Amino acid sequence: MAKYNDPLVRGRADPYVYKHTDGNYYFTATYPAYDRICIRKAATINGITDAEEKVIWRKHEEGIMASHVWAPEIHYIDGNWYIYFAAGESKRIWEIRPYVLQCTGPDPMTDEWIELGMMQAHRSPTGRRKTGYDSYSFTEFSLDATTFEHKGKRYMIWAEKVHRRFGISNLYIAEMETPNKLKTVQVLLCTPDYDWERIDFWVCEGPAVLKHDGKIFVTYSASATGQMYCMGMLSADENADLLDPKSWTKKRYPVLKTDPEKKVFGPGHNCFTTGDDGEVLCILHYRDYSDKYISGDPLNNPDRHAHVLEVQFENGEPVFRL
């Protein structure tokens, strides 16, 4: 008998689960209508399934933050709650950028959330001539921002497209100055090099961070959002300079991909959390049927469900077995 509900939550893609210091789990994910952000609170992982869903923010009617509300993540940083998410504009729905919400009180379920606006890139006060001016971050299609702390520094990793015409989606990393502003220029972390990252679209997105046994692992999702969607992985030594691309090693093959025999299609956009008994869990989404049953763009199909996968470790590295 499975330990965790399967699926954990139906109709929720891009799931994110945060376990707070009080032992409670907070769940958020992309809402199928792409028009709101909801959170759930539960004392156990399985409790998330039937937990009350609270709408804490809705899209704007016009202007920015008015369409394609995607991939929210809830974080607790320096005593405050934040949600990072991506959204497009009302008249330019693909002008997607990362935005930040902050909770005004200690209870994210009942206290008010306010908008801090778009994530801010690093800007040198002396202008472009000064070394360190970032004129690239968040200037193009940008989404899937995640954040983590390591050795007293906070970092952000996100996906951003380059070459607007061709649309390659890369992963970038930078140190953060505040919860809504970068401290350093962006550093290219990962680009779609391999065939399995280039099916229909050239994509690296949905980064998730896991620390284990002296290493930092970053999983990410590759290719288009149908059954070709899969997970890749990067790793770095915990003592390395995380802003040096040479510190990172990339797997040449996907660490998780479609398995028709197990009815797993397009696994990806995961996060990591700690299970009820302290085990490492991967929370991810996938469909339970093939793309051939989908009419139109898989992105518009609501049947991506949140699932739980217990992470195993071999030779110090995470292994993802369905």
For each of these PLM feature ranges, what is it?
Residues 1-322:
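Carbohydrate-active catalytic/glycan-binding domains of CAZyme proteins
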